[in-house]
Swiss-Prot record:
Name of the protein this chain belongs to: Ribosome-recycling factor
Lineage: Bacteria, Thermotogati, Thermotogota, Thermotogae, Petrotogales
Gene that encodes the chain: frr
Pfam families on file: RRF (PF01765)
Keywords on record: Cytoplasm, Protein biosynthesis
Natural source organism: Petrotoga mobilis (strain DSM 10674 / SJ95)
PANTHER family: MITOCHONDRIAL RIBOSOME RECYCLING FACTOR PSEUDO 1 (PTHR20982:SF3), RIBOSOME RECYCLING FACTOR (PTHR20982)
Gene Ontology BP terms: translational termination
Entry similarity comment: Belongs to the RRF family.
Length: 187
């Protein structure tokens, strides 16, 4: 691939961050498989401060479709159990006195379809964000061209580079979506 312009590199960097955000959000989507990423947004009351669970405990994937949460301070067992049970994820946490265990039930076919629909919406939002980056960066190129800093041909070349980067990132977003869709439907 030919060396990219600074305009294209800037667009590429912003689009890369958008894709990373999309992947991070998909990690939080509940499939039937146990994952610790789902618990990143659940906060527990830690001495009066809402604190993410992963900052007060060790999370690990256990056997039999469970996540095991081992708090560093045993006093946190009950608040962790309470935070998980009151979350909107539909999990049931069990405190055995040493650790909190969270079972991941198999989602029904209907739940799986709803999850796929939700991640499809996330994909579309990601594509819109990518296109907005393209629009903003092409607008910058046109402004610079109008100032006379670059020629018409250079501006056209930069716009084509930015469009190519958009296509690459939209294709990558589709691949990420398809992997997650497959994971949901097969779990």
């Amino acid at each position: 691939m030919a060396k990219r312009s600074s305009y294209a590199k800037e667009a590429e960097e912003k689009m890369k961050k958008t894709l990373e955000h999309f992947e991070d959000e998909l990690k939080k989507v509940r499939t039937g498989r146990p994952t610790t990423a789902i618990f990143e947004d659940i906060k527990v009351d830690y001495y009066g401060m809402p604190t993410p669970i992963n900052q007060v405990a060790t999370l690990s994937v256990g056997e039999e479709r469970t996540v095991v949460i081992t708090p560093w301070d045993k006093k946190m067992l009950e608040p962790i159990e309470k935070a998980i049970n009151s979350s909107n994820f539909g999990f049931h946490a069990i405190n055995d006195g040493n650790v909190v265990r969270v079972s991941f039930p198999n989602p029904t076919i209907e739940e799986r379809r709803k999850l796929v629909k939700a991640i499809k919406e996330m994909l579309e939002e990601t594509k819109v964000a990518l296109r907005n980056i393209r629009r903003d960066d092409i607008k910058k190129v046109k402004e610079i061209k109008n100032e006379g800093s670059i020629s018409e041909d250079e501006a056209k070349k930069f716009e084509e580079e930015i469009q190519e980067i958009l296509k690459e990132n939209e294709d990558e977003a589709e691949k990420i979506f398809q992997r997650k869709e497959k994971e949901i439907m097969e779990s």
